[in-house]
């Protein structure tokens, strides 16, 4: 049956610009992050929190714009989107203002309702009197009985107790109680004989009543984010279940009675403490989605191969030492998550899983793949082998990359890209070879005509092939932390280039042709040996970020004033930089500037000591362009 999610609240997040004293590495595309098979949003506990500080006015690296706004930590509701567990949020926990007419000792608790059209909780009152939470629940049950309601949503209503009168709601087909403070369920819950969907996620349940087995029609049971230390025995008696969510509990053991749930098509045991999976898993032959990620599994039972209808199997972030050969029986498999385990090898039988479109084994200890494995998986579009122990590309030749659009080999020990390895990869647009041992690039690099993103950062490259100018579709080029002494003049032919990262090389100069990169938005030259910048840099009118700190610059060209879109400028740690051009004040969009450890002796000491804002003001005041 369809799962309603129209009332799922969205939590507004705010952010504001912060001062950065050193540029961060930019332009590097992130490695593939795998996938979550139950498609749920992250809880507030798992979301990163952003901590910001207001810029100091007396620092020499600072935000030139006005500071404002506040930082809010990420938070999402557990409402459902397409493919998620059931349930929608129509109310949120809150304690709005109580009626001033009531004595404090008898003031009822206020329930706030979050309306779909607004992010602001609104107190619900009737005739000036706040509704008591428990009384409200009882009234809802009474209404359910009288009107034969089919769907009842009491999510996020600060409910702590479900009253026995729930037994009267026998007409219910969908019952949503997620996001409350319920620690136990009454036995009367077993009277809801027509119930098909029961959402109890984000509560404090430690057990379930045996009467739950009376729910003979139950299809979907959501118990995510509770406090279950084991799978309650009564769950194994719910033979009609097709979808079971047990994510983020404290479950350590999965019992053999799991075999009783033969109707399951979706099972999520993600983020528990499971060390072993019973062979009984093989009885769940209707399973299409199985999420066992973020547990402590070291091995899988051979019986996993009996789950022949699986299309998605997520095993990432476990302690797996091996994968059974029976994995090859899962001929319908489309997504297989193996990231961050302890695998040293991949079974040959995986070549039978020809419907897979992504192969991701990031964060293991694999040094080689079975011969021809990738070539057999002809539908692959994304290959991620990053953070392993590869010394060379997988054997299989050009055929293994025929339909691939993205390859990530970051953080391995590869010292060579074979000539012609991508000769059949006509759709390859992204290649990440960051943190390897490359000393040179293949002579046929000019044939990679569809390439959009190249990352060769943190290798040992001493030069770039002149043919790099043939990559007419290239938009992002990362060459940071290499040993480059020069950039070929042909760099100017990369007309679509938006990001060029040359940080931490040995460059003493830049070709004037760099000014031909009219689409360039981010240019990173930090930590080189540059003594000057070409005047043609003024032609980069789309540039928003320029980092030339930690060089040997003696001056900045006057043409820098034509960079009308420049927002961030880092010129820190240039020991010979004694003055700045007045034209710098023409960069009206400049918001962040770093001048730490630059003498700037041509400027008054009190101006330099006042930081970038005062420096810019001084340049404006004394500039011959001040009337402009």
Curated annotation (Swiss-Prot):
Keywords: Leucine-rich repeat, Repeat
PROSITE patterns (UniProt xref): LRR
Highest rank taxon of the organism: Eukaryota
Pfam families for this protein: LRR_14, LRR_8
UniProt xrefs under InterPro entries: Leu-rich_rpt, Leu-rich_rpt_typical-subtyp, LRR-SigEffector_domain, LRR_dom_sf, LRR_R13L4/SHOC2-like
UniProt keyword annotation of Membrane present: no
Coiled-coil boundaries: none
Region feature (Disordered): 23-130
Compositionally biased residues, Low complexity: 69-92
Start-end of each LRR repeat: 148-169, 171-192, 194-216, 217-238, 240-262, 263-284, 286-307, 309-330, 332-353, 355-376, 379-400, 403-424, 427-448, 450-471, 473-494, 496-517, 519-540, 542-563, 565-587, 589-610
Biased composition (Basic and acidic residues): 104-120
Chain's role: Acts as a Ras effector and participates in MAPK pathway activation. Probably acts as a regulatory subunit of protein phosphatase that specifically dephosphorylates Raf kinase and stimulate Raf activity at specialized signaling complexes upon Ras activation.
Family from the record: Belongs to the SHOC2 family.
Family annotation (PANTHER family): LEUCINE-RICH REPEAT AND IQ DOMAIN-CONTAINING PROTEIN 4, LEUCINE-RICH REPEAT-CONTAINING
Protein name: Leucine-rich repeat protein soc-2 homolog
Organism from which the protein derives: Culex quinquefasciatus
UniProt lineage: Eukaryota, Metazoa, Ecdysozoa, Arthropoda, Hexapoda
């Amino acid at each position: 049956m369809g799962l309603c999610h129209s009332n799922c609240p969205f939590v507004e997040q705010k952010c504001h610009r912060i001062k950065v004293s050193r540029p961060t590495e930019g332009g590097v595309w992130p490695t593939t992050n795998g996938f979550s098979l139950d498609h749920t949003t992250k809880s507030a506990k798992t979301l990163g929190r952003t901590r910001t500080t207001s810029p100091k006015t007396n620092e020499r690296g600072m935000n030139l714009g006005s500071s404002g706004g506040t930082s809010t930590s990420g938070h999402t509701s557990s409402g459902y989107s397409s493919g998620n567990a059931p349930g929608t949020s129509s109310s949120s926990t809150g304690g709005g203002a109580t009626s001033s007419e009531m004595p404090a000792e008898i003031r009822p608790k206020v329930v706030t309702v979050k309306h779909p059209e607004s992010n602001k909780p609104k107190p619900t009152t009737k005739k000036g009197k706040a509704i008591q939470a428990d009384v409200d629940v009882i009234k809802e049950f009474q209404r359910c009985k009288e009107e034969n309601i089919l769907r009842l949503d009491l999510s996020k209503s600060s409910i702590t107790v479900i009253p026995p009168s729930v037994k009267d709601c026998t007409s219910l087909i969908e019952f949503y109680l997620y996001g409350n403070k319920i620690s136990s369920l009454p036995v009367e819950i077993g009277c809801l004989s027509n119930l098909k969907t029961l959402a109890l996620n984000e509560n404090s349940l430690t057990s379930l009543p045996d009467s739950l087995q009376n729910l003979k029609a139950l299809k979907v049971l959501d118990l995510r984010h509770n406090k279950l230390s084991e799978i309650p025995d009564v769950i194994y008696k719910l033979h009609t279940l097709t979808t079971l969510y047990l994510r983020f509990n404290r479950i350590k053991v999965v019992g053999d009675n799991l075999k009783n749930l033969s109707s399951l098509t979706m099972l999520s045991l993600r983020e528990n403490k499971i060390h072993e999976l019973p062979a009984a898993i093989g009885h769940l032959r209707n399973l299409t989605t199985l999420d066992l990620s973020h547990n402590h599994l070291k091995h899988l039972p051979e019986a996993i191969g009996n789950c022949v209808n699986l299309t998605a199997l997520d095993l990432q972030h476990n302690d797996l030492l091996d994968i059974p050969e029976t994995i090859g029986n899962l001929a319908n498999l489309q997504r297989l998550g193996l990231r961050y385990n302890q695998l040293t090898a991949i079974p040959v039988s995986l070549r039978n899983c020809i419907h897979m479109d992504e192969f991701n084994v990031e964060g293991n200890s694999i040094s080689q793949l079975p011969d021809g494995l990738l070539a057999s998986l002809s539908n692959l579009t994304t290959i991620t082998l990053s953070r392993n122990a590869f010394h060379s590309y997988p054997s299989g030749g050009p055929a293994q990359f025929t339909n691939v659009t993205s390859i990530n080999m970051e953080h391995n020990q590869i010292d060579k890209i074979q000539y012609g390895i991508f000769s059949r990869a006509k759709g390859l647009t992204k290649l990440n070879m960051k943190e390897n041992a490359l000393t040179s690039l293949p002579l046929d690099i000019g044939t990679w005509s569809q390439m959009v993103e190249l990352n060769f950062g943190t290798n040992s490259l001493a030069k770039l092939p002149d043919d790099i100018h043939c990559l007419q579709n290239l938009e992002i080029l990362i060459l940071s932390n290499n040993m480059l002494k020069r950039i070929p003049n042909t760099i100017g032919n990369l007309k679509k280039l938006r990001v060029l990262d040359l940080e931490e090389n040995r460059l003493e100069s830049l070709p004037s042709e760099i000014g031909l990169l009219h689409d360039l938005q981010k240019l990173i030259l930090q930590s080189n040996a540059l003594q000057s910048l070409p005047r043609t840099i003024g032609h980069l009118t789309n540039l928003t970020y320029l980092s030339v700190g930690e060089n040997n610059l003696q001056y900045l060209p006057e043409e820098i004033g034509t960079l009308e879109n420049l927002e961030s400028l880092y010129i820190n740690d240039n020991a010979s930089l004694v003055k700045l051009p007045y034209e710098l004040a023409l960069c009206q969009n400049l918001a962040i500037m770093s001048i730490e450890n630059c003498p700037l002796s041509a400027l008054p000491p009190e101006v330099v000591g006042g930081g970038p804002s005062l420096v810019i003001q001084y340049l404006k005041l004394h500039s011959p362009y001040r009337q402009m």
